[in-house]
Every structure is written in structure tokens, then in C-alpha cells.
């Protein structure tokens, strides 16, 4: 075979599935597989560099975000309205969202943090909840699971007692109702107790970047992907 002659690879595939053709080719040709791996590696490095640029831009703009924060606080129930709209679109009517008093996002080289402040309420004792989401620092970490942590949530006594009564009453029902225990805590409170990457990144990427649109309910299209993702997550449980 001459140096310039193309290697022939025997492939069986469905004509109406072009993606299968490429997958089959990469599986059977080690040179193509090596090339694919190299491209994937470069793509990861590119994504990491873009993320670093985004962080640098945010750091430069943070003083402006803080200035904006003070102005937004002058609008009555601004963040409470935004979080209520968000979880309504996810299918939850949640009293706790109306108790959000302030909100801010900080971004560092290794993580971003959501600071959610609360006014006095009958559900949780926390005055502030901080949700921390780690961000990759190497291209290898891009494919790893994101670590998310949250402030321990202190449920008020009446909330705890109500949940306990609900659980006790459900113990006497059929086994098929056992899954309902997971639904006792839902919506915003569930997110605070067990935050998800999809909702956290959506809040930062869409809500935080354009809060006026969210306040005026002019961001319906932004929610489409989040609603689909949240629905898939519920089905997988």
C-alpha cells in the first residue's frame, strides 16, 4: 500500500443513521480513534480557557454587580418575586421563595457561590444560605462530577413536627405509597437542602445575569432547557 493510499475500513451500518457510520469507523480504525481523542482533548482545553476568561470578566465586573445589588434592593420583593417565578415554572408553589430578601453571586478560580438571604419566616431559621458549586481547574476535571455543598438548613420546629406527622401517617398506608415521603419536601426548600447543578447554573447564567427580565417574567424561553432537564431528573428517581 502506498504512503498516500487511503486505508479501507469495512463498515456495516444503517444508511439512515449517519452517526452510526462514524461511530463504527472510529471503533474499527485506531488512527481515527487516536485523532478523535486528540480533538476531544483540545476541545476540553479550549472549554477550560473560555471558562477562565468568563471568571476574569466576572471578577472585573464584580464592583458593578455590587452597585447593582444595592439598587435592586430598593425594588419591593424583587428577589422574592424572581425565585417565586422560577419555581412556579418548575411546577412548585412555594411559600419560602417569597421570603428571599437578597441574593448575590461570587465567583472564584475554583468555585462559584450563591448567597441567598431570608427575612423572618416560619419555615427555616437560617438568615442566609450559601450554595457552593466547584468549577474545574483542569481539562480532565471537566468530565468529572461537579461537587455542590450547602449551608445546613435549620427547619423550624413547627415545620419539623408537620413533616413527622405526615411520615407517621404514611407508614400505615400501602407499600406503593412509600415513595411519597420523598415528595414531602419539594421545590425551593428541597433545592436548598440538596442543590442541583442544573438549577444552580441556571440561576447564575440566566437569572443573575438578567434579573430584570426574570422579575418581569420576560424570560420564558430561557426556562425551556431547565424544565426539560428537571423533568428528566424526576423521572430517573
Curated annotation (Swiss-Prot):
InterPro entries: NAP-like_sf (IPR037231), NAP_family (IPR002164). Residues 141-182, 214-237 are annotated as: Disordered. One of its GO terms (molecular function) is chromatin binding. GO terms for cellular component: chromatin; nucleus. Residues 141-152 have a biased composition (Polar residues). It comes from the Eukaryota. Residues 156-173 have a biased composition (Basic and acidic residues). GO terms for biological process: nucleosome assembly. Belongs to the nucleosome assembly protein (NAP) family. This is Protein set homolog. It comes from Dictyostelium discoideum (Social amoeba). The lineage of its organism: Eukaryota, Amoebozoa, Evosea, Eumycetozoa, Dictyostelia.
Amino acid at each position: 500500500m502506498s504512503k498516500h493510499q487511503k486505508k479501507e475500513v469495512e463498515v456495516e451500518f444503517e444508511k439512515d443513521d449517519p452517526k452510526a457510520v462514524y461511530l463504527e469507523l472510529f471503533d474499527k480504525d485506531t488512527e481515527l480513534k487516536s485523532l478523535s481523542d486528540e480533538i476531544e482533548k483540545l476541545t476540553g482545553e479550549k472549554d477550560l480557557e473560555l471558562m477562565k476568561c468568563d471568571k476574569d470578566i466576572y471578577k472585573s465586573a464584580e464592583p458593578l454587580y455590587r452597585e447593582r445589588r444595592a439598587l435592586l434592593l430598593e425594588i419591593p420583593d424583587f428577589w422574592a418575586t424572581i425565585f417565586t417565578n422560577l419555581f412556579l415554572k418548575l411546577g412548585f408553589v412555594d411559600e419560602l421563595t417569597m421570603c428571599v430578601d437578597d441574593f448575590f453571586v461570587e465567583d472564584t478560580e475554583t468555585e462559584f457561590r450563591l448567597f441567598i438571604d431570608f427575612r423572618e419566616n416560619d419555615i427555616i431559621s437560617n438568615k442566609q444560605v450559601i450554595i457552593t458549586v466547584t468549577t474545574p481547574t483542569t481539562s480532565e476535571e471537566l468530565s468529572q462530577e461537579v461537587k455542590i455543598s450547602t449551608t445546613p438548613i435549620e427547619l423550624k420546629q413547627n415545620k419539623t413536627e408537620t413533616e413527622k406527622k405526615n411520615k407517621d401517617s404514611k407508614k400505615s398506608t400501602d407499600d406503593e405509597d412509600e415513595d411519597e415521603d420523598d415528595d414531602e419536601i419539594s421545590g425551593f426548600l428541597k433545592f436548598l437542602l440538596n442543590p442541583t447543578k442544573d438549577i444552580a447554573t441556571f440561576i447564575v447564567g440566566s437569572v443573575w445575569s438578567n434579573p430584570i427580565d426574570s422579575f418581569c417574567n420576560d424570560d420564558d424561553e430561557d426556562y425551556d432547557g431547565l424544565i426539560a432537564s428537571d423533568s428528566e431528573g424526576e423521572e430517573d428517581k
